[in-house]
């Protein structure tokens, strides 16, 4: 039945989008689906054998609480780390301040901070005489704050909390949560102490702190320097005719504190978390009871994570014994916890829990790029150069050492590559087993993320972290060796321009243009939680045509439903000579159906009756879009193909509506794209590989959430 449905759907797409003059050279009926089925119903029972023991066993009214042993740290994480009924509001992690430039008493430091708060309040409350603007006031305030950060850094967080509230940036509780001792106040002391507040850093910082204070800076292009010029006639990569399967997972956001039966439709972020009953004994009203397998406003519970993993084999035709050639994970393992609820141990435990399950179900190496939530505080990564690899520059090395050691432990990386990752922000370059003609280069994209305040330092230098120098070195070595390259990162550099710093995205675009299409075959991202594709062109996208299209950025759909999305993942069929994508299959599960599943599991959760979630083939990229662009059946799904898709959208708006449907993984809650303005914006996003290009598009249509 599932195969028949997919064939009918593919034929319908062909009829709807066929070119009016030329017959398609591609026939959807020729699609060979990768798995034994196109629809798979996951067993309701939780597969308890995936973990050796449990603090709390899985059941119809609770998520499991597995005992997680860390093979690298040689520790067992305690139950109270993830106990859903006792979520912590603080941690014992090191609090790192910049070294003060003078030796002053605590009382003097407190007085300096108090005086600074008064002065900054005066600056903002003064009138605009003399041509002062809100932005210039903010820059002046930063100079005062910098004095506190340099002289009395330990008093800096309390000052930020006070100003955040008094200037009405947010509520006091939110200000305390963000900038207090258990938030990011110490990190902001580091940033202000090191920033060029009177220059570009200051403008970025003010824009970061409040979007209405300073206009967001536009791109200031810095010319990238390469070891060698681009070859005038580079050798064209040859296809082998042999294809392998590659799995692409992204943004699981496992929530080990997910509480079944809690409020799933809450008004505060995030839902499906336990809340204490009122002291008067009344039963709180719950509008939507958190289902066992997850909900639209919640991150992934264990039940959903394991359900998705169980579906991969039947749907893709792979298994632990017959694995994909390799798999990609484009970041974000950790749930969207508030800053005071996270800790280093919480991050480490989640990393182990997820990769243990991946190891059990997927097999083969899994190449991971860290996401902005794969650290604590979330979004924060400091460049080593902030203090020449000293205390501040190495403050996140605990995580780089941990993940790289785990990757070596699971035999996903050779020890030499794991060592490279431990000293390069968890970024590395590796060739998969049996495929020396391909090099995979992963990046830590937090270092160019708009919401990482450390990335705002030395803003005029797009490679302050050295991440792009690392990328150029590896790409040049690949070019010299005749290798193909896949770049794997979390944060997309383009689309609507809302994620990557403008200068960094521009610099990355220059690198892509220099080494494409003869070296870089594909780029893979995550982060948006949505199914998207972006095209990079020659000459910084000034001429967006089929002839100028160079390479595609594939954005993988998320496993988490957050927010208002279905759960999904993708599998590619790839030629082992050119490492071009020849086919892409995307799979999903309807999260809206989960409210009917909770009661079907027995009391122990290890031998349940009934059915769990249904995962199914959502679409074949070739069958869906190929007829619309008359794409030959043996041609790769490359940048030229995707540019053709955007041209087809210009001719037929219905294709943009279909793309938007798939963007949210066919979620009933996703926004639709039914206007000409939306269609034009969507096409513009797809043709925008940098922040500057994306910002030129009509805003407001980038996300379906």
Predicted regions and their residues:
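Fungal secretory targeting signals
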Residues: 1-22
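Short, surface-exposed basic-aromatic patches at helix termini and helix-loop junctions that form
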Residues: 358-360, 503-517, 536-549, 573-574
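Active-site environment of divalent metal-dependent phosphoester hydrolases
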Residues: 256, 335-338, 368-379, 449-450, ...
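Core catalytic region of metal-dependent phosphoesterases/phosphodiesterases
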Residues: 297-392
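Acidic, His- and aromatic-enriched active-site or binding-groove loops in soluble protein domains
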Residues: 349-361, 389-413, 509, 513, ...
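Active-site neighborhood of phospho(di)ester-bond hydrolases with catalytic His/Asp-centered motifs
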Residues: 248-250, 325-332, 365-372, 486-490, ...
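Active-site-proximal segments of metal-dependent phosphoesterases and phosphodiesterases across multiple
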Residues: 449-469, 473-524, 535
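Metal-dependent phosphoesterase/phosphodiesterase active-site architecture
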Residues: 19-190, 196-207, 213-318, 326-329, ...
């Amino acid at each position: 039945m599932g195969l028949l449905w997919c064939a009918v759907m593919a034929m319908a797409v062909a009829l709807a989008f066929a070119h009016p003059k030329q017959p398609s050279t591609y026939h959807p009926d020729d699609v060979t689906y990768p798995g034994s089925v196109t629809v798979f119903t996951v067993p309701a029972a939780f597969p308890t054998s995936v973990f050796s023991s449990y603090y709390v066993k899985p059941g119809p009214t609770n998520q499991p609480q597995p005992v997680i042993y860390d093979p690298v740290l040689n520790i067992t994480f305690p139950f109270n780390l993830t106990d859903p009924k006792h979520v912590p509001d603080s941690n014992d992690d090191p609090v790192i301040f910049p070294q003060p430039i003078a030796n002053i008493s605590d009382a003097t430091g407190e007085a300096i901070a108090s005086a600074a708060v008064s002065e900054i309040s005066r600056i903002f409350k003064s009138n605009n005489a003399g041509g002062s603007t809100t932005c210039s006031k903010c820059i002046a305030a930063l100079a005062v704050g910098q004095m506190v950060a340099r002289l009395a850094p330990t008093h800096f967080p309390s000052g930020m909390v006070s100003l955040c509230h008094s200037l009405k940036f947010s509520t006091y509780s939110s200000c305390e949560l963000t900038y207090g001792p258990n938030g990011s106040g110490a990190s902001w002391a580091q940033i202000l102490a090191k920033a060029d507040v009177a220059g570009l850093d200051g403008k970025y910082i003010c824009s970061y702190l409040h979007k209405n204070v300073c206009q967001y800076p536009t791109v200031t292009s810095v010319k990238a320097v390469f070891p060698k010029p681009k070859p005038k006639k580079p050798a064209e990569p040859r296809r082998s005719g042999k294809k392998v399967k590659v799995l692409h997972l992204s943004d699981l956001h496992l929530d080990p504190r997910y509480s079944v039966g809690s409020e799933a439709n809450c008004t505060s972020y995030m839902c499906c978390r336990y809340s204490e009953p009122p002291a008067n004994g009344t039963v709180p009203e719950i509008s939507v009871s958190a289902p066992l397998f997850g909900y639209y406003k919640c991150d992934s519970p264990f039940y959903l994570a394991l359900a998705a993993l169980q579906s991969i084999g039947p749907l893709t035709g792979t298994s632990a014994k017959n694995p994909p050639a390799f798999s990609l994970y484009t970041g974000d393992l950790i749930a969207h916890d508030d800053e005071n609820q996270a800790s280093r141990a919480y991050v480490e435990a989640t990393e182990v829990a997820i990769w243990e399950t991946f190891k059990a179900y997927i097999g083969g190496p899994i190449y991971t790029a860290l996401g902005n939530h794969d650290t604590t505080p979330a979004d924060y990564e400091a460049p080593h150069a902030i203090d020449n690899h000293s205390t501040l520059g190495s403050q996140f090395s605990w995580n780089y050492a941990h993940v790289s050691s785990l990757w070596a432990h699971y035999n996903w990386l050779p020890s030499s590559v794991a060592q490279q990752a431990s000293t390069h922000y968890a970024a590395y370059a590796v060739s998969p087993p049996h495929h020396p003609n391909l090099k995979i280069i992963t990046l830590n994209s937090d270092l160019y993320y708009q919401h990482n305040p450390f990335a705002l330092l030395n803003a005029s230098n797009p490679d302050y972290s050295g991440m792009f120098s690392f990328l150029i070195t590896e790409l040049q070595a690949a070019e010299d060796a005749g290798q193909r390259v896949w770049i794997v990162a979390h944060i997309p550099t383009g689309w609507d321009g809302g994620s990557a710093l403008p200068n960094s995205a521009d610099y990355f675009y220059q690198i892509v243009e220099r080494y494409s299409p003869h070296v870089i075959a594909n780029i893979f991202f995550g982060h948006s939680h949505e199914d998207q594709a972006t095209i990079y062109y020659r000459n910084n996208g000034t001429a967006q045509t089929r002839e100028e299209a160079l390479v595609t950025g594939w954005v993988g759909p998320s496993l988490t439903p957050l927010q208002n999305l279905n759960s999904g993942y993708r599998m590619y069929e790839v030629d082992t000579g050119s490492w071009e994508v020849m086919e892409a299959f995307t799979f999903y599960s309807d999260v809206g159906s989960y409210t009917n599943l909770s009661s079907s599991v027995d009391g122990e959760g290890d031998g349940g009756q009934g059915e769990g979630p249904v995962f199914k083939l959502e679409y074949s990229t070739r069958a869906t879009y190929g007829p619309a662009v008359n794409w030959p059946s043996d041609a790769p799904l490359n940048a030229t193909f995707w540019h053709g898709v955007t041209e087809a959208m210009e001719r037929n708006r219905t294709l943009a509506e279909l793309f938007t449907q798939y963007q949210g993984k066919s979620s009933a809650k996703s926004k639709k794209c039914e206007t000409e303005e939306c269609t034009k914006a969507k096409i513009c996003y797809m043709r925008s590989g940098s922040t500057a290009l994306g910002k030129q598009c009509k805003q407001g249509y980038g996300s379906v959430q």
